[in-house]
Amino acid sequence: MVDNKDFNEELKENIQEELDNETKAENPNIDEEVEEVSEDIKADEKVIDFEELKALKEENTMFKSKTKKLENELEALKDRLLRISAEYENYRKRTDKEKERIYTDACEDVLIKMLPVLDNLERALAVDGTVEDLKKGVEMTVRQFEDALEKLQVEEISTENGFDPELHQAMMVVEQEGAEPNQVAQVFQKGYKRGDKVIRHSMVTVTK
């Protein structure tokens, strides 16, 4: 008995073979045409690959160009930073020297005005005389010292307008009959200022 499955397979193969033969009979060049189509497809694939490669090369060239441009810009920024750093360092050195010169000149100016006061004090100590003579010498030296402070634009801090924490330092608070509160009752140590700059606060007692 013949197997139906094998019979069907054999029948399909026979039919397919007959169809192929009929196709070849109608189109004797079918194999060549199929081969040409295959060659065209392969050629198209090569063209596609070439175009993609060309695009990649162009993209790579553009990337290299941008990279080179960025590298040049980076080098320019580095050079600029180095120049600015060098200029700042030179400026700092010049500023330090200028500050030192100003400080030295200021100290020299103060000493020039104060040394005569020291000279007079030394002369007063060297002279033999009465207490009155010594007192007169000290008074003269004090006046000379005050003149030197005036030339330096240094003035004594006033206490006439009452206690001011910006100018005075309260040592204690006292009761004083007939005095208004927050007034300077006594000055323990005078204060001095130059312009708006307080050199030394006045040490005072303040009324309640």
Swiss-Prot record:
Record GO biological process: protein folding
Short name of any one Pfam family annotated for the protein: GrpE
UniProt biased composition (Basic and acidic residues): 1-25
Composition-biased stretches (Acidic residues): 29-38
Disordered: annotated span: 1-38
Subcellular location: Cytoplasm
InterPro entries: GrpE, GrpE_coiled_coil, GrpE_head
GO molecular function list: adenyl-nucleotide exchange factor activity; protein homodimerization activity; protein-folding chaperone binding; unfolded protein binding
Keyword field: Chaperone, Cytoplasm, Stress response
One GO location term (cellular component): cytoplasm
Keyword Chloroplast: no
Gene3D superfamilies cross-referenced by the UniProt entry: 3.90.20.20, Head domain of nucleotide exchange factor GrpE (2.30.22.10)
Function: Participates actively in the response to hyperosmotic and heat shock by preventing the aggregation of stress-denatured proteins, in association with DnaK and GrpE. It is the nucleotide exchange factor for DnaK and may function as a thermosensor. Unfolded proteins bind initially to DnaJ; upon interaction with the DnaJ-bound protein, DnaK hydrolyzes its bound ATP, resulting in the formation of a stable complex. GrpE releases ADP from DnaK; ATP binding to DnaK triggers the release of the substrate protein, thus completing the reaction cycle.
Assembly: Homodimer.
Family of this protein: Belongs to the GrpE family.
This protein's name: Protein GrpE
